[in-house]
Each structure stands twice: as structure tokens, then as C-alpha cells.
Amino acid sequence: MTFQELGLNEPILRALADQGYEQPSPIQAKAIPPALTGRDVLGCAQTGTGKTCAFASPILQRLSEARTPDHRLRALILTPTRELAIQIGESFAAYGAHLSLRHTVIFGGVGQNPQVEALGRGVDILVATPGRLMDLYQQGFVRLEDLEIFVPVSYTHLRAHET
């Protein structure tokens, strides 16, 4: 199976090739086709299996096929940690390199002004941690009325229990 057979468009195929992707992983092969049609997908897989690509590439394709000139927020990816938010933001930048969509990442622990400025320029995709999302939403900098896609990202942290 190839990424082309999954139904991804040429700009995304080119970006995946730029990143060294040759063929889809099992989670990508199962998740991408239904996600491209707008169906809800719940995916679970180990670290390093390509989960981010499995949800990011269909989001990028769906939004690029129905572009809006004003870059309204249409996809929200909610992640528990700053580190994961940054990683997912980097993936959106890489997979969307040949598209005209805008994304930004917001998280706490840093000044909010650069994040507010990025939101003010308009974004199609927002990757956020819950605390900063709520802060900027309550201040009126994040508007959700045009939201089409919501992806809650979580991870499982395993730790040994003392006996």
C-alpha cells in the first residue's frame, strides 16, 4: 500500500516524500482513508508509529480542499503538554509545507504576546495545551465558531508501582 493509494493529494505526498516517508504504517493505513471522508477516528498505537501523520495529513488535505481566504480557525488539536504541542506543530509545518494553510502552537509557561499576534494574523489549524487555550479563549483571542475538526491528543504514561 502507498500513501497515494490512501487518497492523499500531491502536495501532501510531496511533503511526506520530503520527510522520508515511503509507505504508510499500519495506523496510517487504517486511519487516513476514513479521516479523509470526515469520519471520526480513534487511533491507538505505540510511540514512533506515525500517529501524528495519521491525523495531520487528512486534516491538511480536507482544509486545503475547502480553503478560506481569511484563515479562520477550523481545526483544533488539543494536547496535554507543551513538548507534544511543539512536536505536533512541527509535523503540521512539515506535512503542510506545500500548502497555503496556516497553523500555530499555543502553550503556557511563555509570554502570550507572540501567540496572540500569530492568532491575529489568522490560522487554519491551532495546536494548543488546555490552560493556554482557555486563557486566550476567555480573553477573546481564540474563536471557535468556525471549528470543523477537533483532535484530542493524549498519551499514556506508564510507571512502575511500588509493592
Regions found by a protein language model. Give the residues of each.
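Conserved pre-motif I regulatory segment
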Residues: T2-L42
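Amphipathic alpha-helical segments that mediate coupling or scaffolding at interfaces
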Residues: L6, A15, Q19, P34-A35, ...
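Conserved P-loop/Walker A NTP-binding site and adjacent catalytic elements of P-loop NTPases
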Residues: K30-A97
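Conserved nucleic-acid-binding Ia/Ib motif block in the N-terminal RecA-like helicase ATPase lobe
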Residues: H71-D135
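Walker B beta-strand of ABC/ABC-like P-loop ATPase nucleotide-binding domains
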Residues: V127, V151-P152
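Walker B catalytic acidic pair
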Residues: P130, S154-Y155
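Short basic/glycine-enriched coil/helix segment immediately N-terminal to the Walker B
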Residues: Q139-E148
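Conserved small/polar residues in nucleotide/adenosyl-binding loops
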Residues: T156-T163
